[in-house]
Amino acid sequence: MASSAPRGLRSDHVVTVGIALFSMLFGAGNLIIPPLLALQAGTATPLAMIGFLIAAIGLPVMGFIAVALAGTARELASRVHPKFGEFFVAAVYLAIGPCLAIPRTSSTAFEMLVPLLPEGVSLGTARLVFAVAFFVVAFALTLRPGVITRVLGRITGPALIALIVLVVGAAVISPLGPAAAPQAPYDAGAAVQGFLTGYQTMDLLASLAFGIIIAETIHELGVTDDKRVAFEISRSGVIAGVLMAIIYCGLALAGMQLGTVMPDATNGAAILARSASMHFGLAGTVVVFVIFFLACMNVCIGLISCCSRYFCETYVVEGGAEASEEAMRRPFAILAFVFAAFSCVLSNVGLDVILMFSVPMLNALYPVAIVLVLMGLVHGFCDAHPQVWVWVGGVVAVQSVITSVRDAFFAGAWLPFDALPLADIGAAWAPVAVVAFVIGLAHSQFVAHSRS
């Protein structure tokens, strides 16, 4: 008797999960980076966007696939060493969670509300009230994991897409101006600078974390075979990636048209707000606020949920991921409340302070995430040469942390890494990874030869 093929998702479920994934990834940073990139890149925008799309979409989609193949982000990173996996994944969750990304969602949404506030209103009081209300809603939705996909995939996700299409469509139909000449640093090496700018979305790190929620959702929809789950995650990731690519290009077009109107702009949010107000007046300002609110709320819900579940399964509940939902419910709710409350407090220090800490943290984590994902995609070869994991993961982590600490606290100090190729564009980790890979191969062969 022929065995039946593993059950997969229906097409409409794949689309729903893909849109939910898009909603989890597409936050404030995704909205504000492309317009600023295009305004500064000007006529070099096509080249800059190629690099940006590779980093902001290609790497996260590869991240989803690599995690699906490995099982979890921790299992992927633990190929370097179990302790390394534990520490690295915890750092990723803290970075994309309560220490940076979660408080940034509330702060960014509030910044877009400020132009709509009545004159004389205390910004400090308004920020506090908004943050409390924002995180109360996010916390309430987080406690209903089954609702997350339905809300993000069927309501707020499509609404967000529709509003962005409205703003971008206006820019396409009624251009505001021609592209300006490229500004530094896009006037030299636009594609490379676009790639580095793609770091700021943090979506590669998010892809390592959100796999937990997406995998659970796919299980709930009836897919139980592990290989099939990985395949469905890949399909959903492609859908999310295509949606993001289309919207990124549209947002870039809107920003590129304002290069001569506001050449000194330093904030993508201001660029979008200006574009919308020039097309729609006050209604445009309201639309932009709603766009930012939906994007930030979507991401906040996903981040609180995945961070709470990870730390709950890893450090709190006995049995970890194998524990029953009943055993998980109370600890999960407590952690979700703690993360939401902490993020609420941190968000009140203001967006500028939060963003000040983002660059060194991302520069320390991103190179490690990139090499882990790339090795995860060819895990069969790397698993056959296990020392490759140790050398590449360990050496790149050391190099990235040292460089990030130098950049944050000792700017201008010279390091030996500065003499390496690509160091001038912040990618000294790449040649370091190549050398470590070769050493890891040689080490693996030496160990295998010694045993034989």
Features from the language model and the residues they span:
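Select transmembrane alpha-helical segments in multipass membrane proteins
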Residues: 10-21, 46, 83-96, 128-132, ...
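Hydrophobic, membrane-embedded alpha-helices of multi-pass small-molecule transporters
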Residues: 16-26, 31, 170-177, 185-254, ...
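Helix-loop-helix connectors at the membrane interface of multi-pass transporters/channels
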Residues: 37, 107-126, 219-220, 300-337
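Membrane-water interface regions at transmembrane-helix termini and the short interhelical loops
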Residues: 68-75, 134-156, 220-223, 341-356, ...
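TM-loop-TM module centered on a large, flexible mid-protein loop between adjacent transmembrane helices
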Residues: 73-78, 247-297, 359-362
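Membrane-interface loop-to-helix entry segments
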Residues: 141-171, 358-370, 389-398
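Hydrophobic, small-residue-rich membrane helices and short re-entrant helix-turn-helix hairpins
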Residues: 144-155, 191-194, 214-243, 260-273, ...
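C-terminal membrane-solvent junction of multi-pass transporters and transport-like membrane proteins
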Residues: 370-438, 449-452
